[in-house]
């Protein structure tokens, strides 16, 4: 596995933990919990980071 792919793989694994634990917290929080928006932002940031990594690691178009 080349260095870029290994980096993306390792980062996605770590982000998966952040997203997974965020989802667990959200599942256990009441809808009116004042911390809920903050945890949701953490989850969304993790998902955005995964999407960014996937776009960065995608093969170039048109080649």
PLM regions with names:
Residues 1, 19, 58:
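Extended interaction regions within the primary functional domain
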Residues 1-6, 55:
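PAS-family sensory modules
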Residues 36-63:
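Conserved DHp (HisKA) dimerization/phosphotransfer helix of two-component histidine kinases, i.e.
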Residues 5-13:
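Conserved phosphoacceptor histidine of two-component systems
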Residues 26-33:
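Short acidic helix/loop segment immediately C-terminal to the autophosphorylated histidine
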Residues 25-26, 57:
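A conserved position within tetratricopeptide repeats
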């Amino acid at each position: 596995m080349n260095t870029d792919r290994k980096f993306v793989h390792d980062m996605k694994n770590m982000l998966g933990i952040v997203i997974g634990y965020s989802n667990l917290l959200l599942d256990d929080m009441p809808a009116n919990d004042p911390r809920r928006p903050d945890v949701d932002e953490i989850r969304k940031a993790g998902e955005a980071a995964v999407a960014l990594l996937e776009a960065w690691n995608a093969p170039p178009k048109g080649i």
